Amino acid sequence: HAFCLEQREDLKWPASMYLEGSDQHRGWFHSSLLESSGTRGKAPYESVLTHGFVVDGRGRKMSKSLGNVISPDDILKKYGVDILRLWVVASDYYDDLKLDNAILQSQAESYRRIRNTFRFLIGNLNDFTKEEAIDESEFPELEKYLLHRLWEVDQVVQKCVSTFNFHLMFTTLLNFCSSDLSAFYFDIRKDTIYCDSKESVQRRSTRTLLNIIFNHLVRWF
């Protein structure tokens, strides 16, 4: 902190957060706190966030002797960078982060569900304009219920972001996409979208809500 934060005008001291592995409780976190408190009378950070270490699917340390090391390059070649990112955000970093091919395959399935949710939304919002939108007060009961569920999810997401609980945030969003949307709302309103007239209140309400959901999901993800 003395050679970085205090020497650069574009950075502030104390740091808003120190982020490191659990081994740094007696290392960097501790030594920085002692030095800064002794020379400046104040901690060099406002908060500390600790994460676990990457281990294999059985919770063992990765090593060449065990033959359980998974190279990031191999993951990128087989699954792509988005699956690796998804694994990171879906992992509960308060504990060690388990990683193997079965876990990555599970995240690939989660990615497929999220992608299909966006595909449905984009495909059924073609040519949607603000003139077609209908006031939320005129929504049918089903749309009002989904609007309430959207609000509930947003409350969880905001709290998770402020507390860095990305694991719960991702689980909440995945369940919302899979259960509330794909398995429930989308399935019910398919006939409305495909069969009702463009001027019908129910179809306009459905498309208005789909637009609201889409904009929320884009911000959340």
Kindly label every feature range from the protein language model.
Residues 198-199:
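Acidic, serine/threonine/proline-rich low-complexity intrinsically disordered regions
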Residues 133-143, 153-158:
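Short His/Asp/Glu-rich catalytic/ion-coordination signatures at enzyme active sites or charged loops
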